Amino acid sequence: MAASQTFSLLAFTFSLLAFASTVSSHNITQILADSPDYSSFNSYLSQTKLADEINSRTTITVLVLNNGAMSALAGKHPLSVIKSALSLLVLLDYYDPQKLHKISKGTTLSTTLYQTTGNAPGNLGFVNITDLKGGKVGFGSAASGSKLDSSYTKSVKQIPYNISILEIDAPIIAPGVLTAPAPSASLSNITGLLEKAGCKTFANLLVSSGVLKTYESAVEKGLTVFAPSDEAFKAEGVPDLTKLTQAEVVSLLEYHALAEYKPKGSLKTNKNNISTLATNGAGKFDLTTSTSGDEVILHTGVAPSRLADTVLDATPVVIFTVDNVLLPAELFGKSKSPSPAPAPEPVTAPTPSPADAPSPTAASPPAPPTDESPESAPSDSPTGSANSKSANAAVGVSTPSLFTALVTIAAIAVSVSLCS
């Protein structure tokens, strides 16, 4: 009887494990790689780094444009404007074909990635989705007076409740997005933006040291700036900059910038060491990143610093404020780890008396190492109408933390069975 119960429990446990392992991450670039019709759209997702933002999120819908529709959009506008337009095609909700054709009351507004940029006044960051006659679905800006100028054409790929990719026949145009001038990243504009963002000390140091010109020389190919606030320079533990040599000040300021465009989404998905403008050799003056929820933490080897706000995001330039001065280990030494406690003196334990029966508990095996804790998907997920040929490459399957608990249950069940 006990053996039968144990077998049933084990079967149930491993069924749960099989279900849990179906939870997937996604890679939009790889999903679209096998669809030549979207090669232009896919390329612009990479150029604008929107691909990283999409990959860092779940419960998301991407409205893709074929090469013809994408060419009409991209041929007339700078990259920063294209990024804004494409951000309107990324919905922060999951819409598969079934849900799309069964919208409550026939119409709804959906939040887009553009809404999260802080550049969308009013409801410009929302999209109107409306079910039309004949089974058609229309899309348009949520701005007052906007028309449904875009229509759903077909499904491309679904990873249920994680990401849905749908094709539409035209871009969704929000008033003012395509006509907005591209933000400037000139010398005067950078310092002005920094001062307005509460980073006057940092801006003054860039000018007085001449490092601002180094920043300017990197603008064309890509520049990411981490600007400490004025309060950050007053914080306890920040060294007296007047005691640094000119070369050390230059290295410190160059350490606060990257010679590449790396917006927040790219920093969130980063797994490698990041070179800075101060990097002069392998492993020198670099940074690493980690995430906590939606926050990005920069690590220098001395002390962490949190990404606070986005001052400017104008491809290929992005400027962030950070809440601590970035202190490179090459100048200020690595943070000291606490000394290990002395080992306790060995104690001779008394001889235990024999037990009447073996213990019904067993130690659970350690959880397998993992970089992230993926979320589980609902069990009633619908099936997508089209699948990518490279599903294994585009979908990263990882085991959730539930694994440990389930294996523990199985181990206890086996132990109980043996004791019975």
From Swiss-Prot:
Glycans are attached at residues 27, 128, 162, 189, 273. Residues 26-172, 186-326 form the FAS1 domain. GO terms for cellular component: apoplast; cytosol; plasma membrane; secretory vesicle; side of membrane. It is found in: Cell membrane. Expressed mainly in flowers and to a lesser extent in leaves and roots. Its main location: membrane. SUPFAM superfamilies: FAS1 domain. A lipid is attached at residue 392 (GPI-anchor amidated asparagine). Transmembrane segments: none annotated. Induction: Down-regulated by abscisic acid (ABA). Residues 1-25 form the signal peptide. Gene3D superfamilies: FAS1 domain (2.30.180.10). Keywords: Cell membrane, Glycoprotein, GPI-anchor, Lipoprotein, Membrane, Proteoglycan, Repeat, Signal. PROSITE patterns: FAS1. Residues 339-371 have a biased composition (Pro residues). Residues 335-394 are annotated as: Disordered. Belongs to the fasciclin-like AGP family. May be a cell surface adhesion protein. This is Fasciclin-like arabinogalactan protein 8. It comes from Arabidopsis thaliana (Mouse-ear cress).
